[in-house]
Amino acid sequence: SFRGGKDAELVRRGETFAVLEAVTQRTRQEDQEPDDPARVRITVGTPDAQRPGRYASVNGAPPKRAAGLAGSFPAVVFDPGHLSLVKGAPEGRRRFLDAALCQLYPGYLATYRRYVRALQQKNALLRHSAGGTERPWAEKCALLEVLNVELAAQGEAIQKRRREYLALLGPLACANYAELSHGAERMAVHYAAQFEPGGLSALLKQRQNEELRAGQSLCGIHREDVELLLDDQPAKVFASQGQQRSVVLSLKMAEAAAAARITGEHPVLLLDDVLSELDEGRKQYLLTRMKEKQ
């Protein structure tokens, strides 16, 4: 199952590697000729395999960058785990945004990785400071300043993409919810930001002493959230289980519609046992919408 937390868990028990291969052909606009077919092959080796780890090829050749594979096969995955988007932690809602953006925009994954790398380095420095492993004060402040410059640059770019994407996704999701609920409640989607555009650098400077005392980073795009509201109330607090499912279904169908608008082609919808988690009305809504996209 793809639900495993580690690549090695994708490999069948008793084997040393697993292979996933697909031949894809893309047409970005209905009036355009389709692209040439591409054979994409991904291999995952266990630690004791002749070649451990994950590696990929496109038409027999490795991609120039691993990030280059992102978006090569546009797909929207919907599995039971997504049903926790409403009541789950903010991390899951950020992951929902970032996974979609990695497919839609070349370079987003590289930007995100640069942010994460700088954040890890900063947290390591802050932990050592709080734990008594002291660097000279001037050296510590200089290192933090360098890392904060990188975090501000990458964080601003990430937040900008997230805001732009939600500006498209939100109205689509709200329209879906209105159709599903027959107008019983009004859904709203907001980006809960820690800073206004252009303000991350100042925020990092403002909270630097607080972060030194806490031993961890306290601000940035890794602390932001997506607010899901029903009739202006937080869905994670007040929504029933049925309403939560409607919110998630509305978001996932909006994700597919947003991808089609941005790229000019409909993504593949991958449903993993999610129909068993939906009641008859929501199941029929999903199947009807899927038929419309064929």
Protein language model features and the residues they cover:
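Short alpha-helix boundary/capping segments
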Residues: 88, 107-110, 239-244
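Aromatic side chains
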Residues: 2, 78, 96, 108, ...
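Conserved NTPase motor "head" modules and their coupling/switch loops across ABC/AAA+ ATPases, GTPases
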Residues: 16, 28-32, 135-270, 277-293
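Conserved protein kinase catalytic domain
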Residues: 11, 70, 97-98, 119, ...
